[in-house]
UniProtKB/Swiss-Prot annotation:
Extracellular-side segments: 250-259, 324-332, 383-427, 449-482
Gene from which the chain derives: KCNH4
Name of protein: Voltage-gated delayed rectifier potassium channel KCNH4
Function: Pore-forming (alpha) subunit of a voltage-gated delayed rectifier. Activates at more negative voltages, exhibits fast prepulse-independent activation kinetics and deactivates much more slowly, but shows no inactivation.
Region Disordered: start-end pairs: 138-157, 691-749, 772-803, 821-875, 971-1017
Subcellular location as annotated: Membrane
Originating organism: Homo sapiens (Human)
Source lineage: Eukaryota, Metazoa, Chordata, Craniata, Vertebrata
Catalysed reaction equations from the record: K(+)(in) = K(+)(out)
């Protein structure tokens, strides 16, 4: 027969395991998604971390796990780089880092990062554990005195030997913490396993669905073996209920020794079974009041000691062993054996288990009726014996035993000797009690004395009741006693019939049955809304407020009036979700806001964990503007759709607030509507509205680019960039169209340097480069050459803004002395221009230099500086510094490339040799202009300082002179384009080596200079 198994669906108890295992020193932890495409966002934040840092859970969720909002001036940059490297490699990492709380106070933290794997071995989460070690004597943050010296040491300790000394001291302290076993974690490799030798390290749990089951020594209460054992104990209990009254009443009737009794062996065997049952009960699981299956040995033992242990212990006392060892016993010991009848209370406990089967219930009731008749037969026999002993045996012979002996012709001699046998007397007594219980009897065995008549009256009264229960209205009594269970079985039968008629698949059938059973275990089939429907609204609102007090105590409803809360409580319903079930799916219409009362859920998108929700979390979507509510605004078809899946990890109790009911209440209380719409995005743990990733989700990770106001000059300077380094373009060649330019291939000129991705370098929170174009007030001034020639419009040439316009000569802007120059739109290396007028693909780089602001400058009206804005400003400053470093490195590479190009020019000059003109040359070159710079490459108009020799190289057009070039000609005309700079202007790139000249090669000249549009890149 089936047993109530309890809540046995597989659950993902990862969150509870982490909170239990890292309790105390490791209660401050974060969980981050290791499979995210945009960094590693935080998906769970413990309450201890919020208390440690001062940030709320909604402020931390979806931010990067590197915790940039905790950085400050004393945060070590090398330690952060090692942390980022460990994150990219999915490796364990431990470090001591100086973090800053929300109020700006600094604290030293022992950061421990561990990857979490699933059942397939894939890293799906990162676990970050934070330990405040400020009071343990960390450098630079001592509790007393010396803070200024420590800060000075911190400012100087990042360079040279001081930094190495502090690093060594921190490593030694980390080893000390490992040896004391305060911070255990799963080791990797032999050396890590030996670091903690005094205490075993707790293993990191896997993020997976836990298997149901426990130790092999535990006995599951719903297993087959437990059912067989319960059946055996049930038979033993019936045996005790039959034999104990019989032995007590008929023990002193004959002279047979007790040790020769036929039931002695069976009695001892039953006692051993009861003792063994006590031992097994200490190892048997049970179902708690909340429906959970308890498998902890300690909890099982305490529960058994508080319930049935003493009753089972008294019933299992081995009284029959006293007879084996020939210990003299009195009649009181025989009466103590009646205590074993308390085992029948366990039978009443099992009746509820087997009550779902009508046949079993009827059988048990019949057995109880027969057992009652047996007990009354034993009492009827004792009454007859006591009547014989109380009266004169020579004169008194009217008892029912005397009458039975006369009829059986075995009369009593002297009132006590002789008489019918024990067997005959028991059968006659049982016959009398059964006839009295079921009817009025037949008179062959009747009551003659007063005591016998009183007992007969009691027997008839009990018989009338038992007859009505068993034979009169068994079905009515079962329905009255088990009405709720009958309803349960009725609904279960309807559910099974529905599944059978519609032929539902087995997985769907299992889910339906599991949900029905677990829901029934929570609310016992009571529909609160149906039950409270007939109550008045005033009383029903008060009851609803009491039932939904958890969700109504949120800060979101703090500004609501009592009437508003009463109206809201009437639209709140309690729901339940089993493990593995989807509460919402992506793209579904969001019709309610959900508050998690118990259990945990996960938010998924494309099988990636976006957030883990626990008790006290609110999930839903922000409310649209007034007039756009579903069914209330101008658009009645407006529907909010979910952007992710919500799946239950454990058994979850939820309270859902209907969106339509919420809109109705907000319309009735407009004074609270504005406060609710403003506070809902702040209190939502996760926003499920589609499009919140781009518009609303940014509130979780407040990007400095989005939270801080931008300068107006920034937007007006989107087109103020430095021009490319170009060369003048001559007039069109008559009779010929534009030819494609060929890049000058320079293989193996410099060793390859690996370049990191700019996206990974700048962080995912930086806006695109097109939005970071420098303004005129923030960018260095243009060179005089550009100012004088580049900004004048030509009436005959193409307009300056067109792609075909090029300056008349090589223009290189001068470098400022305040820092690395801004990078102008530049042609990507390796992309050839087909000669069209379309703009070539380019990258735009710009930098906004930090403008000094007077310290006395007050913040704008209505704004106050906060630690959060300060941390965001520090983050922006850090990213800008890193961008400047990258730009400087790129400029150095461009400078190196320029020097190599100059070296190649020198080699070409030596290869071509002195100029010469054959007599039959058809190309008459123009004399070079002594006032013009060489068109191929030229230094800047003003030499930059020696410390800044970085130059930008974008495009170098080297057009040849107009005409047809023959072999051995135009050497004299080509020399100006490849000559070194004028002696009067020193080369900022350094002297270029020019080897000795060599005779010209016709093939080289023919392939090198074919048209005036050949270019070098």
């Amino acid at each position: 027969m089936p047993v109530m198994k309890g809540l046995l669906a597989p659950q993902n108890t990862f969150l509870d395991t982490i909170a239990t295992r890292f309790d105390g020193t490791h209660s401050n932890f974060l969980l981050a998604n290791a499979q995210g495409t945009r960094g590693f966002p935080i998906v769970y934040c413990s309450d201890g971390f919020c208390e440690l840092t001062g940030y709320g859970r909604t402020e931390v969720m979806q931010k990067t796990c590197s915790c940039r909002f905790l950085y400050g001036p004393e945060t070590s940059e090398p330690a952060l780089q090692r942390l980022h490297k460990a994150l990219e490699g999915h490796q364990e990492h431990r470090a001591e880092i100086c973090f800053y709380r929300k109020d700006g106070s600094a604290f030293w933290c022992l950061l421990d990062m561990m990857p979490i794997k699933n059942e397939m071995g894939e890293v799906v989460l990162f676990l970050f554990s934070f330990k405040d070690i400020t009071q343990s004597g960390s450098p630079g943050l001592g509790p007393q005195g010396g803070r200024g010296d420590s800060n000075h040491e911190n400012s100087l300790g990042r360079r040279g030997a001081t930094w190495k000394f502090r690093s060594a001291r921190r490593r030694s302290r980390t080893v000390l913490h490992r040896l004391t076993g305060h911070f255990g974690r799963r080791g990797q490799g032999g050396m890590k396993a030996n670091n903690n030798v005094f205490e075993p390290k707790p293993s990191v749990p896997e993020y997976k669905v836990a298997s149901v089951g426990g130790s092999r020594c535990l006995l599951l209460h719903y297993s087959v073996s437990k059912a067989i054992w319960d059946g055996l104990i049930l038979l033993a209990t019936f045996y005790v209920a039959v034999t104990v009254p019989y032995n007590v009443c008929f023990s002193g009737d004959d002279d047979t020794p007790i040790t020769s009794r036929h039931t002695l062996v069976s009695d001892i065997a039953v006692e051993m079974l009861f003792i063994l049952d006590i031992i097994l009960n200490f190892r048997t699981t049970y179902v708690s009041q909340s429906g959970q299956v308890i498998s902890a040995p300690r909890s099982i033992g305490l529960h058994y000691l508080a319930t049935w242990f003493f009753i089972d212990l008294i019933a299992a006392l081995p009284f029959d062993l006293l007879y084996i060892f020939n210990i003299t016993v009195t009649s009181l010991v025989h009466l103590l054996k009646t205590v074993r009848l308390l085992r029948l209370l366990r039978l009443l406990q099992k009746l509820e288990r087997y009550s779902q089967c009508s046949a079993v219930v009827l059988t048990l009731l019949m057995s109880v009726f027969a057992l009652l008749a047996h007990w009354m037969a034993c009492i009827w026999y004792v009454i007859g014996r006591r009547e014989m002993e109380a009266n004169d045996p020579l004169l008194w012979d009217i008892g029912w035993l005397h009458e039975l002996g006369k009829r059986l012709e075995v009369p009593y001699v002297n009132g006590s000797v002789g008489g019918p046998s024990r067997r005959s007397a028991y059968i006659a007594a049982l016959y009398f009690t059964l006839s009295s219980l079921t009817s009025v009897g037949f008179g062959n065995v009747c009551a003659n004395t007063d005591a016998e008549k009183i007992f007969s009256i009691c027997t008839m009264l009990i018989g009338a009741l038992m007859h009505a229960v068993v034979f009169g209205n068994v079905t009515a009594i079962i329905q009255r006693m088990y009405s709720r269970r009958s309803l349960y079985h009725s609904r279960m039968k309807d559910l099974k019939d529905f599944i059978r008629v519609h032929r539902l698949p087995r997985p769907l059938k299992q889910r339906m049955l599991e949900y029905f059973q677990t829901t029934w275990a929570v609310n016992s089939g009571i529909d609160a809304n149906e039950l409270l429907r007939d109550f008045p609204d005033e009383l029903r609102a008060d009851i609803a407020m009491h039932l939904n007090r958890e969700i109504l105590q949120l800060p979101l409803f703090g500004a609501a009036s009592r009437g508003c809360l009463r109206a809201l409580s009437l639209h709140i319903k309690t729901s339940f979700c089993a493990p593995g079930e989807y509460l919402l799916r992506r793209g579904d219409a969001l019709q309610a806001h959900y508050y998690v009362c118990s259990g945990s859920l996960e938010v998924l998108r494309d099988n990636m964990v976006l957030a883990i929700l626990g008790k006290g979390d609110l999930i839903g979507a922000d409310i649209p503007e007034p007039g756009q509510e579903p069914g209330l605004g101008a658009d009645p078809n407006f529907v909010l759709k979910t952007s992710a899946d919500v799946k239950a990890l454990t058994y979850c109790g939820l309270q859902q607030l209907s969106s339509r009911g919420l809109a109705e209440v907000l319309r009735l209380y407009p004074e609270y509507g504005a406060a609710f719409r403003a506070g809902l995005p702040r209190d939502l743990t996760f926003n499920l509205r589609q499009g919140s990733d781009t518009s609303g989700l940014s509130r979780f990770s407040r990007s400095p680019r989005l939270s801080q106001p931008r300068s107006e000059s920034l937007g007006s300077s989107s087109d103020k960039t430095l021009p490319s380094i170009t060369e003048a373009e001559s007039g069109a060649e008559p009779g010929g169209g534009p030819r494609p330019r060929r890049p000058l291939l320079l293989p193996n000129l410099s060793p390859a340097r690996p370049r990191g991705s700019l996206v990974s370098l700048l962080g995912e929170e930086l806006p695109p480069f097109s939005a970071l174009v420098s303004s005129p007030s923030l960018s260095p001034s243009l060179s005089p050459a550009l100012a004088g020639q580049g900004h004048s419009a030509s009436p005959h040439g193409p307009p300056r803004c067109s792609a075909a316009w090029k300056p008349p000569q090589l223009l290189i802007p001068p470098l400022g002395t305040f820092g690395p120059p801004d990078l102008s739109p530049r042609i990507v290396d390796g992309i050839e221009d087909s000669g069209s007028t379309a703009e070539a693909p380019s990258f735009r780089f710009s930098r906004r230099p930090e403008l000094p602001r007077p310290r006395s400058q007050a913040p704008p009206t209505g704004t106050r500086p906060s630690p959060e804005l300060a941390s965001e400003a520090e983050e922006v400053k850090e990213k800008v510094c890193r961008l400047n470093q990258e730009i400087s490195r790129l400029n150095q590479e461009v400078s190196q490339l320029s020097r190599e190009l100059r070296h190649i020019m020198g080699l070409l000059q030596a290869r071509l040799g002195p100029p010469g003109h054959p007599a039959g040359s058809a190309w008459t070159p123009d004399p070079p202009c002594p006032q013009l710079r060489p068109p191929c490459l030229s230094p800047c108009a003003s030499r930059p300082p020696p410390s800044l020799q970085d130059t930008t190289l974008a495009e170098v057009h080297c057009p040849a002179s107009v005409g047809t070039m023959e072999t051995g000609t135009a050497l004299l005309d080509l020399r100006p384009s490849i000559l070194p700079p004028y002696p009067s202007e020193p080369d900022p790139l350094g002297p270029s080596p020019v080897p000795e000249a060599s005779p010209p090669t016709p093939s080289l000249l023919r392939h090198s200079f074919q048209s005036r549009s050949d270019t070098f890149h």
